[in-house]
From Swiss-Prot:
Cross-referenced InterPro entries: LysM1-like, LysM_dom, LysM_dom_sf
Gene Ontology molecular function: chitin binding
PROSITE patterns (alphabetical): LYSM
Record-given protein name: Non-secreted LysM effector LysM5
Alphabetical UniProt keywords: Chitin-binding, Repeat, Virulence
């Protein structure tokens, strides 16, 4: 009978000493399996060998798969607290059998394997059915005649050796017709359609059970590398599911918190030292929380902490400190750089440490998957919490998502939990961006997927809607709610701001939007306007030169002689809006220059829930720009609040600063701030609201 041992012929006492692991873990790792020694060793690096049908058949016996499943489960229990030091890294000992079983799954999968019983996914594949004569239909394509699927082997891995494809589609650059193709000019400039997997394989191969099962096992593996190509594969997976309508053919993809194997500086007392857990060296924080290390969240003064008494017969320090500090166990480990949830350093040297913003904490039981746990959490408003959200709230989760340890975790976004919308805000539903191109086209089509949008105005300093994420500036006076299908770019376009503004006003998204894929959540509110920004005006009203109060929000450039305003609603077009207010489209465009000459900008700048001028003295009906009292035409784009007596404008260029711009235009910085209130008193808003390619007032009477 075939037998496999991980460490055959080596005395267990020597191994235990060499590996510095418990004897129980070593016994579990070195258990005898009913598998061929050579073939099972090959399974530990399945893609490093060329498998024949005979090899796979000899390995994939019921006895081998059953003993492999038992081995995996036994090591998960016996090695839960053991680490191995190899290749300069520390990693959980239980990952050793995990990699073997992961390879076994790849070698043994057939078109008839029940993936829900796969040991690497959820249990065991022992009961999977293998049909001796199972085949998969051959792929056909007039352009891909070489892509034939083997009908000899029942094993998908062996079949896959006959799946011939291409990494990308390359145009024939010798053909003069393709001489201007971007891909021929720059081979690295590959359009998305030329690297889409669905375009690289014919549908009958792409949608075959073997192709789907192999693809699923690879991206569901807990050992999927954390590289860009893995992200590409996951994106392609969901595309393939849509094309093949195959969601019922494979389990849902389990979202895991990627493991990070720390560098290995050494071990002591059964715990690797602090560096092993990825703890950076603590730097002293000032007692007031201003430090030589920036704390972006809570500064905790250790001398002021007064935690509850701990009953060590039934509790651990972590059991008490996590609810006391309203932080996850993993975050407290990170704060103290100690898995005992208590500091082991001198308070006088490091009096203050940094901890994330507070969150609601709940105890996560051991051996619960993230997906299972998240499914038990109540919704936030009408939005179900996702595993991706949960992982973003718990960046220091202890363990991986399909094998967690008992710990406290955040079940709300650090920095804020759900509250009912406040009563001092005005909420409107409907598209935030109007449609229409001047020809009567209805608004409402520019939201993502044509769905409705929610935007909310908040008085400066007022309570924002909820839920939001941390870091939004207090001067934000306009919020918008993201919904399913939104991306950072489309969301910013829908609300008339740039992607850079969205990322600046919502720091959680990253300075260059690098966190948009992981931190941009449906159901959450994001800042889309600051007080005085070009896309947002304060809820306090101003008065036009006719004495008529100016409502909010409005866009820039409205005729200062306006005598009447009206709010656009979802479904309006420029023409319909003009007709409903008993004016001509020409008057609407004249009094609201943002809509463009002849309504050329109606498709992009006519927004639901914004106010537009619908009444002005007859003398201004033919004016397409808002004249100042000195008859100087107002250029575009400008920001709100500019002195109506402005006699001169200048355009800011990339790299300009407020003081430099003022000097360049022969005025003082004080004058610049006075004539352009959006820049704030003393230029307080220059860093956020002084934009290149915008016009600012640089001349006024008496200057």
């Amino acid at each position: 009978m075939a037998q496999f041992n991980l460490y055959p012929g080596v005395p267990s006492d020597l191994l235990s000493t060499a590996f510095n692991i418990s004897s129980g873990c070593l016994t579990a790792l070195n258990a005898t399996l009913s598998c061929d020694q050579d073939l099972f060793s090959m399974a530990g690096n399945a893609d490093g060998f060329f498998w024949s049908d005979d090899n796979a058949t000899a390995l994939c016996t019921g006895a081998c798969q059953s003993s492999a499943a038992s081995w995996w489960n036994s090591c998960a229990d016996a090695c839960a607290n053991d680490q191995l030091n190899a290749y300069g890294r520390i990693y959980p000992a239980q990952t050793v059998p995990g990699r073997f079983v992961d390879g076994l799954n790849i070698v043994c999968v057939t078109a008839n394997t029940d993936l829900t019983l796969d040991v690497g996914i959820n249990g065991t594949i022992t009961n999977s059915t293998f049909l001796d004569n199972s085949t998969t239909a051959s792929a056909t394509s007039e352009n891909l005649v070489s892509r034939q699927i083997s009908s000899i082997s029942q094993y998908c891995l062996v079949q896959s050796y006959d799946w011939v494809g291409s990494d990308i589609i390359r145009p024939d650059c010798t053909d003069p017709a393709n001489s201007n193709s971007s891909q021929c000019v720059d081979p690295t400039d590959v359009p998305p359609e030329n690297e889409r997997l669905a375009n690289l394989y014919p549908d009958d191969l792409l949608c075959s059970q073997c192709f789907l099962s192999m693809f699923y096992l690879r991206i569901a593996s807990p050992f999927l590398p954390d590289v860009d190509h893995s992200d590409y594969l996951v994106d392609q997976w969901f595309d393939i599911l849509d094309i093949c309508n195959a969601t019922s053919k494979v389990p849902d993809l389990l979202v895991r918190n990627l493991p990070y194997y720390q560098y290995a500086p050494g071990e002591s007392d059964n715990w690797v030292d602090n560096t092993t857990y990825g703890f950076s060296d603590l730097q002293p924080l000032g007692g007031n929380g201003t430090t030589n290390v920036t704390c972006q969240a809570r500064s905790i003064n250790l001398a002021d902490l007064n935690p509850p008494e701990i009953d060590y017969t039934t509790q651990t320090t972590c059991d008490v400190m996590a609810p006391f500090l309203n932080a996850s166990t993993g975050d407290i480990w990170q704060m103290y750089q100690n898995p005992d949830c208590m500091p082991d350093f001198d308070y006088t040297e490091i009096p203050v440490v940094c901890l994330p913003f507070s969150c609601s904490v709940t105890q996560l039981n051991a051996n619960t998957t993230c997906d299972q746990f998240v499914a038990t959490l109540p919704a936030i408003g009408n939005n179900t919490i996702t595993t991706t959200q949960f992982l973003s709230w718990n960046p220091n989760l202890i363990g991986i998502c399909d094998n967690t340890t008992e710990q406290y975790v955040c079940t709300s976004a650090p920095g804020g939990t759900y509250i009912s919308p406040p009563t001092n805000i005005t909420t409107s539903s409907g598209d935030s961006r109007g449609g229409g191109d001047g020809s009567g086209t209805s608004t409402g089509s520019s939201g993502v997927g044509g769905s409705s949008r929610n935007s909310t105005l908040v008085a400066p300093g007022g309570t924002p809607p909820s839920p939001t994420q941390s870091g939004i500036p207090s001067t934000c006076d306009r919020y918008a709610q993201a919904q399913s299908g939104d991306g950072c770019d489309s969301f910013s376009q829908d609300f008339g701001i740039t992607s850079q503004q969205l990322e600046t006003w919502n720091p959680v998204l990253g300075s260059n939007g690098e966190n948009c894929l992981t931190q941009f959540f449906a159901g959450y509110w994001y800042c889309v306007g600051l007080v005085g920004s070009a896309t947002s005006t304060a809820t306090t009203t101003t008065t036009s030169s006719t004495g008529v109060p100016t409502p909010s929000p409005v866009q820039s450039g409205i005729d200062p002689q306006c005598t009447k305003y009206s709010e656009a609603v979802s479904g309006d077009s420029c023409i319909a809006f003009a007709s409903a207010n008993n004016i001509t489209p020409a008057q609407l465009y004249s009094w609201n220059p943002v809509l463009g000459s002849g309504g050329s900008n109606c498709g992009s700048d006519f927004w639901a829930n914004e106010y537009y001028c619908v009444g002005a003295p007859d003398g201004s009906a033919t004016t397409t720009t808002a004249p100042t009292s000195t008859a100087v035409a107002t250029p575009s784009p400008i920001q709100s609040g500019i002195d109506p007596q402005c006699t001169k404008f200048a355009e800011a260029a990339s790299g300009d600063s407020c003081p430099g711009f003022a000097t360049k235009n022969g005025i003082t910085a004080t004058e610049l701030y006075s004539w352009n209130p959006v820049l704030g008193a003393g230029g307080a808003n220059c860093n956020s609201d002084f934009w290149a390619n915008e016009y600012y007032c640089v001349g006024a009477p008496g200057s």
